Amino acid sequence: MTDLLRRPLTEITALLARRELSPVELMQATLDRIDAVNGKLNAFVAMRDRDALLADAREAEARIQRREARPLEGVPLGVKDLEDAAGLVTTHGSRVFKDNLV
């Protein structure tokens, strides 16, 4: 699935729209990759619960099935740690803000 994550966004969104790729499959591949490399990279400082992310992916899949998809429906999104995100710790890259929950 790592190959999937190297594809351009235009291809990913087309695969999702044609239902050749499931948002759940894409989210699972993304989470598996994060699990595999984040210990070394520490690219993701805070994340929502895995089960919640997969539930969101299932909801996205349902919207796609109903043809109610939004432009980036089903595409996992990471938010830079410099931007506040509700419910997530935002450190702004500093240990001073290690407990900064918005």
Predicted features and spans:
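An N-terminal boundary/leader segment
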Residues: 1-55
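Hydrophobic transmembrane alpha-helix bundles
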Residues: 6, 63-65, 83
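Secretory-pathway/luminal and periplasmic proteins that interact with or process carbohydrate-rich
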Residues: 36-41, 67, 84-90
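Glycine-rich loop at the start of a catalytic domain that most often binds anionic cofactors/ligands
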Residues: 56-61, 84
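Enzymes and membrane/adaptor proteins characterized by extended Gly/Ser/Thr/Asp/Glu-rich
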Residues: 73-102
